[in-house]
Amino acid sequence: IVVMYAVLFLNRRSALYLVLLKALFALLTRGVTAGFLSLCGGALSLAVFCLLLALPFTITGYIFSVSGALAHNCGQLLGAAALLSDKMAITYAPILLIAGLIVGSCTYMVSRLIFPAVKRIIPPKSKAESKITF
């Protein structure tokens, strides 16, 4: 939710810094593998967020949230494939894709509750949030 908030309400640079800080936190608290997988997932989800915002039409917050969650899990799968083997990483794909759908849906529901209140307190610095309907 934090990176999605930064992409929508701040700017892409802030979102990138958050991805890097989250990966650094994972590295320091859970080790090199967790830091690497966090970076892979965060980078791919940020890239997907940016691509979705570049579309010439408005998309729903649900699609935005679920796409980010699925991209995050796919990024982690790619990172795991690079560290382990493709076959080992692929065995986790169905579980992570289902988890991405569930977590993305939950993220959407929480965002739908939080973002309108945040908009009233802190006006968006980015026009990106106008491309997503929550």
Label every PLM stretch briefly:
Residues 1-6:
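Hydrophobic transmembrane alpha-helices
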Residues 7-10, 14, 21, 28, ...:
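Juxtamembrane/disordered regions of integral membrane proteins
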Residues 10, 18, 38-74:
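Short helix-perturbing small/polar motifs within transmembrane alpha-helices
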Residues 18, 76-80, 107-115:
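Alpha-helical transmembrane segments and their lipid-water interface positions
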Residues 21-50, 61, 83-88:
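Interfacial aromatic-anchored transmembrane helix boundaries in multi-pass membrane proteins
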Residues 35-39, 66-67, 94-102:
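Hydrophobic alpha-helical transmembrane segments of multi-pass membrane proteins
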Residues 70-75, 100-104:
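Membrane-embedded alpha-helical segments of transport systems
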Residues 91-134:
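Alpha-helical transmembrane segments and their cytosolic interface
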